[in-house]
Amino acid sequence: MINRQQGFTLLEVMAALAIFSMLSVLAFMIFSQASELHQRSQKEIQQFNQLQRTITILDNDLLQLVARRNRSTDKIMVLGEEAIFTTQSRDPLAPLSEAQTLLTVHWYLRNHTLYRAVRTSVDGRKDQPAQAMLEHVESFLLESNSGESQELPLSVTLHLQTQQYGGLQRRFALPEQLAREESPAQTQAGNNNHE
């Protein structure tokens, strides 16, 4: 009679366990790296969306700009490291048929976070609670592209320095009808010259 061995030897079982263990460790490492990469890419996407949303809201604010002198600043637009100007907006919770309302918006940088504060009373001094728009901002500057002589510029340039994207620059054209309208001070000066 032939004595046939049934099953595996101890050496074969140990070799199979070692191979299975190595494959399990490799699979875990691959899964862990894929999960880490996914989390990192989601964070990058979220930060980019936050930047894009901030620029879109600033663009909308500037496109809806109203040439109205603010009583607290006595200017139509305050530009620089803080920006204050009047814009028109519709309350998203109000019915669509409701007219747009005037708002004073205030963009400013505090503790590496860019904020947007809104005053629903355009000549009021008290902002509603500011909304954090963009984090990890090193500098924020809005500047006029029409020189210092003109109170209402034709366009403004945003200079934004972020930790993630470095220096960003974006030019925003102001509404064309504002460029054609003269401010009251310019109209008075023009009338005085004709007399």
Curated annotation (Swiss-Prot):
Residues bearing PTM N-methylphenylalanine: F8
Subcellular location: Cell inner membrane
Keywords: Cell inner membrane, Cell membrane, Membrane, Methylation, Protein transport, Transmembrane, Transmembrane helix, Transport
Transmembrane portions of the chain: 8-29
Gene3D superfamilies assigned: GSPII I/J protein-like (3.10.610.10)
SUPFAM superfamilies reported in the protein's UniProt record: Pili subunits
Induction field: Silenced by the DNA-binding protein H-NS under standard growth conditions.
Membrane topology: Single-pass membrane protein
Highest taxon, organism lineage: Bacteria
One Pfam entry name: T2SSJ
Residue stretch(es) of the prosequence: 1-7
One cellular-component annotation, GO: plasma membrane
Main location: membrane
Modifications the protein undergoes after translation, according to the UniProt entry: Cleaved by prepilin peptidase. Methylated by prepilin peptidase at the amino group of the N-terminal phenylalanine once the leader sequence is cleaved by prepilin peptidase.
GO annotation, biological process: protein secretion by the type II secretion system
Record function comment: Component of the type II secretion system required for the energy-dependent secretion of extracellular factors such as proteases and toxins from the periplasm. Part of the pseudopilus tip complex that is critical for the recognition and binding of secretion substrates.
Miscellaneous: Part of a cryptic operon that encodes proteins involved in type II secretion machinery in other organisms, but is not expressed in strain K12.
Description of how the protein assembles with itself and partners: Type II secretion is composed of four main components: the outer membrane complex, the inner membrane complex, the cytoplasmic secretion ATPase and the periplasm-spanning pseudopilus. Interacts with core component GspG.
Assigned protein family: Belongs to the GSP J family.
Protein name stated in the entry: Type II secretion system protein J
Organism: Escherichia coli (strain K12)
Protein's gene: gspJ
